[in-house]
């Protein structure tokens, strides 16, 4: 999605999904999609640890299979894990059965009760089935750290501009994002703490 906050029509498509947490609590929920990979995950974990922050990692099963030591480190350091399918497959390019099987294959490695669809969307049929067994977590703020059109400073500005109580903030644990995260992530964590936000993970 090329938007920092989801449109109302998108929220309407997935009414059972979680888009934002309690707006009356000064807390936010950090999420990282697409990892784990050795080029990005260690830096993210080190930075989170330095700032005393916990996050939820929506991981691709194939990456977990390739880098089990990173999965183990994420869990050992007290972060939450979520399913992001086995092969980061698009929700509109595959049959429902294929999509669900791919998700279940990933969960044999990830062992999660949380799910986020790659690219933030999927057909209604897999959504219907997966929402029976997973808590489907979407987002309230997309930092767009993956965009080649944005600078690291602009990624940080997206966090500052759109974050509010209960925001689910999406970063990416990926090659496309890591260059910007070296600056944007520590600065974002510092700013969030200065604003009095508590870092939380999902039940």
Where are these regions (language model features)?
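A short, conserved beta-to-alpha structural element at the edge of catalytic cores
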Residues: 50-77
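Acidic-and-aromatic substrate-binding clefts and catalytic sites of carbohydrate-active enzymes
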Residues: 35-39, 58-67, 89-97, 116-123, ...
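Catalytic grooves of carbohydrate-active enzymes
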Residues: 159-203
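A cross-domain feature marking catalytic cores of carbohydrate-active enzymes
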Residues: 32-34, 59-62, 83-85, 117-119, ...
